[in-house]
Amino acid sequence: MTLWYHCSKNTIPKTPVELTMPKKTLQLLDPVLLINAYMQGIFPMADHKGKIHWYAPDPRAILEHDNLHVSRSLRATIRKGIYEVRMDTAFELVMCRCAARKETWINETLITTYRQLYHAGLVHSVEAWRDGALVGGLYGVALRGAFMGESMFSRATDASKVCLVALVEHLKARGYVLHDTQFLTPHLAALGVTEIPRRVYEQRLRAALQLNCTWNEMDT
């Protein structure tokens, strides 16, 4: 079951109802509103008409870092160093590549807003490069001890998976305790993602937000 939350320009009510927001009337999603939504376990997605909806899935998909499944072939790819992994060097390109598919929930309004959050140090990208070209990547929102994965793309074998492994290693090293993947898909399930009830997710989110994790040493 997925709950849809109504959200006005300045508030996020707790009553679950549907909201459709015409793109022409919402050229920019308030970044502060967006962060407040994430802190309540709510996130936005656009439909094919450009309207933004707010989601709070129940159950919620998460990745327990110790449960990440790394296949032998993926381990071999990582060991061979086929891809160069970078962080935060091409955020907007990663997001645009994630959006470049037949059906996408990422529109220009979201790209503009997440760009602002990236410059504020709250959104991050992990990238796989080969021969100077970006061939895979992912991005998400980092809030205290929680990381909310948003999307990933791959244009070469295992490129996005290599990014995920690098992300998990980074999050563990920095002390993050909650890795939210929002929805469960067969692809994510194969990597070790599972579901928990929303009430449990909210408890874990509150606990994660009590921490003071930073993305890198320079943020401390």
Protein language model features and the residues they cover:
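N-acyltransferase acceptor-side catalytic subdomain
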Residues: 4-220
